[in-house]
From Swiss-Prot:
This is Meiotic recombination protein SPO11-2. Keywords: DNA-binding, Hydrolase, Isomerase, Magnesium, Metal-binding, Nucleus, Topoisomerase. It comes from Oryza sativa subsp. indica (Rice). The lineage of its organism: Eukaryota, Viridiplantae, Streptophyta, Embryophyta, Tracheophyta. Belongs to the TOP6A family. The gene is SPO11-2. Disulfide bonds: none annotated. GO terms for cellular component: nuclear chromosome. GO terms for biological process: meiotic DNA double-strand break formation; meiotic DNA double-strand break processing; reciprocal meiotic recombination. Its EC number is 5.6.2.2.
Length: 385
């Protein structure tokens, strides 16, 4: 009953293979939580049902993942989850705590939404740690359980009242107009740029004005600040954006909004030449596996500008580094995925064959002003994949 009652609440268009998470108002999310509770209680009182009902969740395992491929060259491909399910059961030893965690998080979300508040994952962790220390001993427990709740209720994380913890920033040829009519001219800011709020509701209401021709996604904050300090956007009409490492939800959200507002503005990624850099690019391009139910909402058609294998001739041998065990682990995961395109796979294979990795900073061997020239040259020459 729980599976039918909650799962039937949302369908993803006409494609029944794809399962999605809806953007919902607080009242609707609270109603879905109430339905889940009622279904669970009904199962407990049904003589024909098992003594303890299991929670039906959409599986995030590899067998249930797929890639919705773009039909046209400039369209966006994205990761999706199909309808294969898994269960959290109180009767299985390995699942018992995870089963309880789902109810604890739903209880907390019900309270948060009733109070009209938003909390970060970190705030949620410390609250649950103080109230239920037996079940929540690390941040990972909260992160995984939130995705379980998203899977059960089929609503987005933001709809649960959980706000993204944004590290992101942007700068360049862009003016932001907020809901209170305030304007931010991102072309006159210091090299740290404009901090991206974690509140997706605020980001969804921003009005953009731009004469840029390109968007450049930068992996590292230090590289972002170098390009901003050089004011690359003064001679190359562009917007710079960074998540300062692995892309957080808010940075992906605003990048997607920019791509929707300016569909003819190409997006380029500047990442390290290592498996982690490619993984970051793929998250922007296809979405996150862990958030498969809502990944399609944030996927963008991102091109790989650099670093790439063709750029290694610009880097001195002394700047190469050995691949680390973590690099090999990421590479293995990427190679086994369904979405890695051929040219990306070739780059990853070259990394493994050479056993080397290189960071963008290695280009500083040509001087600090070389980076901006490198980026501009590659864009103008169409040197990206």
């Amino acid at each position: 009953m729980a599976e039918a009652g909650v799962a039937a609440a949302s369908l993803f268009g006409a494609d029944r293979r794809l399962c999605s998470a809806d953007i919902l108002p607080p009242a609707e999310v609270r109603a879905r939580i109430e339905v889940a509770v009622l279904n669970f209680l009904a199962a407990l009182t049904d003589p024909a049902a098992p003594a303890i009902s299991a929670l039906p969740l959409i599986s995030r395992g590899a067998a249930n993942r797929g890639l919705r491929r773009a039909l046209l060259r400039d369209d966006v491909s994205s990761v999706y989850l199909s309808y294969a399910s898994c269960k959290r059961s109180l009767t299985r030893a390995n699942d018992a705590k995870a089963f309880v965690r789902v109810w604890k998080v739903m209880e907390m979300c019900y309270k948060i939404l009733g109070e009209g508040k938003l909390v970060t994952l970190r705030e949620l962790f410390y609250t649950l740690l103080s109230e239920s220390p037996t079940y929540f001993t690390c941040q990972r427990h909260v992160n995984q359980t939130v995705q379980d709740v998203v899977s059960l209720l089929r609503c987005t994380r933001q709809s649960l009242g959980i706000m993204a913890s944004s590290r992101g920033a942007l700068i360049g040829r862009l003016v932001l107009q907020g809901p209170e009519e305030e304007h931010v001219d991102c072309s006159i800011l210091g090299p740290s740029g404009h901090a991206i709020t974690g509140d997706l509701n605020v980001l969804s209401k921003l009005i953009f004005s731009s004469d840029a021709r390109y968007i450049i996604v930068v992996e590292k904050d230090a590289i972002f600040q170098r390009l901003a300090e050089d004011r690359i956007y003064s001679h190359l009409p562009c917007i710079l954006i960074t998540a300062k490492g692995y892309p957080d939800l808010a940075t992906r959200f605003i990048l997607h909004r920019l791509s929707q507002t300016y569909p003819n503005m190409p997006i380029f990624a500047l990442v390290d030449w290592n498996p982690a850099g490619l993984a970051i690019l793929c998250t922007y391009k296809y979405g996150s596996i862990s958030m498969g139910l809502e990944s399609y909402r944030y996927a963008c058609n991102v091109k790989w500008l650099g670093l790439r294998g063709d750029d290694l001739q610009l880097i001195p041998q002394s700047a190469y580094q050995e691949l680390k065990p973590r690099d090999l682990q990421i590479a293995k995961s990427l190679l086994s995925s369904k979405f890695l395109q051929d040219k990306h796979r070739a780059e990853l294979t070259l990394m493994l064959e050479t056993g080397k990795r290189a960071e963008i900073e290695a280009l500083y061997s040509h001087g600090f002003d070389f980076l901006g020239k490198y980026v501009a040259r590659k864009i103008v020459q169409g040197d990206y994949i």
